[in-house]
């Protein structure tokens, strides 16, 4: 069983990260123990606490760099969700190229277990990896919505809500030591008022996409991306 410090993590992960960065993705390392510490027992992953994992996000540039060419090649005929297929092909290709000597288990955000639970909780994984802050109703004192069911949402420090959490990769047998330290995600929606606004936009007005701009952002989806994503949502796909 391999044991890797921070330098070893960089050596192992950097080629994979660079290959996906070119395609409009971001990659963040984490330990399985960080993830298991914040989810219920039913959602915990059955690996040792020091096992290395990677969470993969897509940025707005992925749409132009990867997805539009994917559509133009007519790769999605008969496919229920072409974005999911495009993302899966991109990640699998980079794993084959850069992590071919590792035993990698890939879980995509849309995959479910036989119990109908998701294979992993995407927003929790992104939060503990330091990629994006997961804002939940419990983060608001005396919420104005009372007992109404409200869902949480992740906000990226540069992209706001203009990104998606796509996959969790577990590198089986690769354990990282204390050199890999957990860094909390930037708390970019810090006030109670802003958090209320964020959660209300996300839960009550999600079709407007305004929650994505709760902070100033560096990139946004193009109009074509929004049109295609809304079409996919109405037909059962995802963005």
What feature does the model see in each segment?
Residues 1-239:
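Auxiliary alpha/beta "docking" domains used to position bulky ligands
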